[in-house]
From Swiss-Prot:
Superkingdom of the source species: Bacteria
Protein name in the entry: Ribosomal small subunit pseudouridine synthase A
One Pfam entry name: S4
An annotated Gene Ontology molecular function: 16S rRNA pseudouridine(516) synthase activity
Enzyme Commission number, as recorded: 5.4.99.19
Residues of the active site: 101 (nucleophile)
GO BP, sorted A to Z: enzyme-directed rRNA pseudouridine synthesis
Keywords (A to Z) from UniProt: Isomerase, RNA-binding, rRNA processing
Segments forming domain S4 RNA-binding: 1-67
Keyword field contains RNA-binding: yes
PANTHER family in the record: PSEUDOURIDINE SYNTHASE, PSEUDOURIDINE SYNTHASE FAMILY PROTEIN-RELATED
Parts of the chain that traverse the membrane: none
Length: 233
């Protein structure tokens, strides 16, 4: 691929912008300065600009630690979109592989690979999602069994699929809940059906992808290849 085309795709730059960047002498390919846009980037070649490696053009897979009060959409009339937390080119090409409510925190996956995100969000694939939940009222002894059997939700014809509930801290009304569906406000509705209320909700895991504990709310990083591939397993 031509160097100017590589930079256009990787940085979201125009051809004119890419040419200017190249002529600045700050672009290196495999450690050597290249000042021609027609230079062919070899397969597996490492491109650097301004001292930083420029990722090869291709699908993007991002893990975001979503804070509260951000929405998982491109536009909203009341709250800021979580996309403003990304310092990335062509954000308009990205989408969420499963959303979180505005007041829910934790793991959100963002990509421009529609097939990959479909694997996560399609009900037929039963992708597991794990949430840490803090409840308003005491955890009842029969909760674990009831979640394992499925919960009857209001205005739903069928009960939820079996879910796994783990009691983490009974004194703090803290549990871990793993579900394989993505119904509207599902976690909150499941506990409401049992007469309880979710006070705080935090997603920790999607499939085999776990929220990086080095990230702070609002931080993000690219997924490793192993994390990307885990979705297909």
């Amino acid at each position: 691929m031509r160097l100017d085309k590589y930079l256009c795709d990787a940085l979201g730059a125009t051809r004119k912008q890419a040419t200017k960047i190249i002529k600045s002498g700050e672009v290196l390919v495999d450690g050597e300065v290249q000042k021609s846009g027609s230079f062919k980037v070899p397969e597996g070649g490492v491109v650097e600009w301004d001292g930083r490696e420029v990722g090869a053009p291709g699908p993007r897979y991002i893990m975001l630690y979503k804070p509260a009060d951000f929405v998982c959409s491109h536009e909203d009339g009341y709250n800021p979109t979580a996309f403003v937390l990304l310092d990335e080119p062509k954000v308009e090409n990205l989408h969420f592989a499963g959303r979180l409510d505005v007041d829910t925190t934790g793991l959100v996956l963002i990509t421009d690979d529609g097939q990959w995100s479909h694997r996560i969000t399609s009900p037929k694939h039963k992708c597991k999602k794990t949430y840490r939940v803090w409840l308003a009222d005491a955890i009842q002894p029969d909760y674990v069994e009831k979640f394992a059997q499925g919960i009857e939700l209001r205005n739903e014809r069928e009960a939820t699929l079996p879910a796994h509930l783990e009691i983490v801290n009974e004194a703090e009304n803290e549990v871990l809940l793993t579900i394989v569906e993505g119904k509207y406000h599902q976690v909150k509705r499941m506990f409401a059906a049992l007469g309880n209320k979710v006070e705080l909700l935090h997603r920790e895991r999607i499939g085999d992808i776990v929220l990086d504990d080095t990230l702070e709310p609002g931080d993000y990083r690219y997924l490793t290849q192993e994390e990307v591939d885990s979705v297909w397993n």
